[in-house]
Amino acid sequence: MVKIAFNTPTAVQKEEARQDVEALLSRTVRTQILTGKELRVATQEKEGSSGRCMLTLLGLSFILAGLIVGGACIYKYFMPKSTIYRGEMCFFDSEDPANSLRGGEPNFLPVTEEADIREDDNIAIIDVPVPSFSDSDPAAIIHDFEKGMTAYLDLLLGNCYLMPLNTSIVMPPKNLVELFGKLASGRYLPQTYVVREDLVAVEEIRDVSNLGIFIYQLCNNRKSFRLRRRDLLLGFNKRAIDKCWKIRHFPNEFIVETKICQE
């Protein structure tokens, strides 16, 4: 006898359910594997992004520190420490005809100035305001002991006049500080005499960039002329002089009257 067997519906359903479970488990495993990989990639990307942020912040910190240090150095170079001194001296002008005819006590004329004295730079910057009782011009004057130069900026004409520094009549900055200290304390009698300079503008200076930063700042973009002493000019024609003017200041314990003539 031959037996013929048939799958019952219940067995078919169990087989299909088993296959569904296996497929679900397979998809779950694949999903977990992919999720793990994605998490690792995301973690690596996050770590890489954090590293780049740290490097960027570190670079910005170095740049900021460099800017601060560089700015401080530039400020120190261009804005060095200095003290403004103010003082006044009086002098008797013996060449004034009015004084020679005047009887009694002599008439002393005041010379007032402000001095920006920078001992570290070995320089004195003197500001001579408009005088009240004399015929001299207001001026800005630089005595640069490092460069060995003196520069006069006539504030009425707007021109610069340059000459070698005359150390026989200009005190070094340290001594000038002491002089202004005496004037301020009243320990020095501010009545003195006059030393006269007779100078002539002989040639125009086109470039002042090699004369130091201070003279450059004073005279750049201005007409600048070289000064020579009149007594050193051979064959000098006095008739060629068109105009002369005076600048008075005290770079010492006396007044210096600088007479400048120009064609």
UniProtKB/Swiss-Prot annotation:
SMART domains assigned to the protein according to its UniProt record, in alphabetical order: BRICHOS
- Carbohydrate-modified residues are N166
Under the heading InterPro entries, the entry gives: BRICHOS_dom, ITM2
Molecular function via GO: amyloid-beta binding
Q: Which PROSITE patterns match?
A: BRICHOS
The processes (GO biological process) annotated in the record are: negative regulation of amyloid precursor protein biosynthetic process; plasma cell differentiation
Q: What is this protein called?
A: Integral membrane protein 2A
Q: Which organism is it from?
A: Homo sapiens
Lineage, highest ranks first? Eukaryota, Metazoa, Chordata, Craniata, Vertebrata
